[in-house]
């Protein structure tokens, strides 16, 4: 399924045990993100969504499950990231961005957060999502209008331009992540769709000012070992150029 046997086994266990915990509240489980696009590699987050009949508030058993899985030897166990979302909320874009039970990459605990409650997540799930259990994702999510994606992208662009100027968390992970994410946002603004990181950067290399091409190419090349890079300082020259890039594109 994913091309990684140990990840397939982990996902199968996750789905089986979540289904057992939720019982008749379980609707389905899905992969989104890089694995849905078919561009994942050994450094990718494992983006999942569990769809439920209602907002799950009794989290004790799920918390225990995620804490246990996080302790497994396979590195994939520390890179699960996803939310538990009611089918009624998932169906169409939620203007309120209701917080959901969310497992962050690297975390062993669910927290209440709207991370997956976005137009982008719905679009990726509907158009590319992989069903681990339950009906096809297209049966659960209405088409996401391009203008909804563009509206969200405009807000995201402002947020990321602001984040570029926050000095306290600059590191070797943030710098290329910011460049790639800005390329994805710009592609969505231009085309009203959502594509993979690689496809968005390829688009950027065709469409953006050549000044930014070395920055985009570098961001693609330094992808391996994101955890290690998180604890390393960002290259000062790349940091300055990334801030300039964020400022320039946020004025488009």
Feature annotation, model-predicted:
Residues 1-29, 58-61:
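Helical scaffold of the NTase/Pol beta-like nucleotidyltransferase catalytic core
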Residues 1-3, 64-172, 179:
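Conserved NTP/Mg2+-binding pocket subregion across the NTase superfamily
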Residues 29-68, 79-86:
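Catalytic metal-binding acidic patch
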Residues 36, 89, 184-187:
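Short, solvent-exposed loop/turn segments at secondary-structure junctions
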Residues 123-252:
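Conserved nucleotidyltransferase catalytic core and NTase-mimicking acidic/glycine-rich helix/loop elements
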